[in-house]
Each structure stands twice: as C-alpha cells, then as structure tokens.
C-alpha cells in the first residue's frame, strides 16, 4: 500500500471543481405539435456559445459560466430554441496567476462542457425531437481567436 505525503500533494498545482450547476435553462417549443410532425428532414441548427468568468474571492475561486443557445429551424417552423447557462466553481490551487486566464478560458470550460451538452441533449429529446448532440468545442482555438482579436 502506498501513502501520499500530504505536504507534497498540497504544494502541487491543481484545479479543484467545487460545484457545478444550472443557472438558467429555457426551452421553447413554439410550433408544437405541428413541428413534431415535420421532422422528416434534418433541421438547421444555429448555435452560439459564450464564456463568462467571475472572480469570487481573493483566494483564487472563480465561477466559469457557459452560455449556450441553440435554435433549430426547418423550412416551415422554428422547431425549438434552448438556452442554457451552466456554471462551475473552480479553485486554482498553487497555480501562477499568469496561467489563470488560459486555464479559466480553456481547461475549466472543457471540464464542464460535457455536462452542459448532456443537459441540452436530454431537454431537446424530452421536447419530442432527436437529442441535440453538440459537437465537441475547441476552447483553445476560441481563446486564441479572442486573444488575437483583442490585439488587433
């Protein structure tokens, strides 16, 4: 049996997830039940994603919030609109503050995204549609794009 030296493990840099939660969830199914009969073709999905980061204290606690909105349409109807604000509280332990922006913008959103994706898939399925399976998101590419836009 191996033992872990607690003094060493506490000095190791790591991210602690203290909580994950739905802040806001809305699903509109405005054309039901007519829209449910018109599912013979794949709908067009318009997806938007935003990340909000809030410093909760001086002790490196942060809330990272994913704001995801998806609107599904076909030729006749707006099939559904779903909006989800899903957040996590993260504690960045023994991590240099210069690394905080990339961790909070890339790694933390990537940790909670699968849970938000599952909620959206379940809600759209419960609304009578095929579950909306959002493709994986490259948060690193989004971060670098945002940083290059700020530099210009």
Swiss-Prot record:
- Specify the species: Rickettsia typhi (strain ATCC VR-144 / Wilmington)
Under InterPro entries, the record lists: SecB (IPR003708), SecB-like_sf (IPR035958)
One CC-aspect GO term? cytoplasm
Q: What is its main location?
A: cytoplasm
Presence of keyword Nucleotide-binding = no
The role this protein plays is: One of the proteins required for the normal export of preproteins out of the cell cytoplasm. It is a molecular chaperone that binds to a subset of precursor proteins, maintaining them in a translocation-competent state. It also specifically binds to its receptor SecA.
| SUPFAM superfamilies tied to this protein | SecB-like (SSF54611)
Recorded protein name is Protein-export protein SecB
Q: Name one GO biological process term.
A: protein tetramerization
Q: Name one Pfam family in it.
A: SecB
Q: Which residues form a coiled coil?
A: none
- Tell me its family: Belongs to the SecB family.
Q: What are the protein's GO molecular function terms?
A: unfolded protein binding
For this protein, the record's HAMAP family field holds: SecB
Protein's gene: secB
């Amino acid at each position: 049996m191996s033992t872990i030296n607690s003094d060493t493990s506490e000095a190791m840099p790591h991210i602690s997830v203290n909580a994950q939660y739905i802040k806001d969830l809305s699903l509109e199914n405005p054309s039901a039940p007519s829209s449910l009969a018109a599912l013979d073709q794949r709908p067009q999905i318009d997806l938007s994603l935003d990340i909000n980061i809030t410093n909760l204290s001086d002790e490196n606690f942060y809330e990272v919030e994913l704001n995801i909105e998806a609107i599904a349409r076909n030729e006749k109807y707006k099939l559904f609109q779903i909006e989800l604000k899903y957040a996590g509280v993260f504690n960045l332990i023994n991590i240099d503050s210069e690394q905080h922006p990339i961790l909070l913008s890339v790694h933390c959103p990537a940790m909670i995204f699968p849970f938000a994706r599952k909620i959206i898939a379940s809600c759209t399925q419960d609304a009578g549609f095929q579950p909306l399976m959002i493709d994986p998101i490259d948060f690193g590419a989004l971060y670098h794009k945002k940083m290059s836009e700020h530099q210009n």
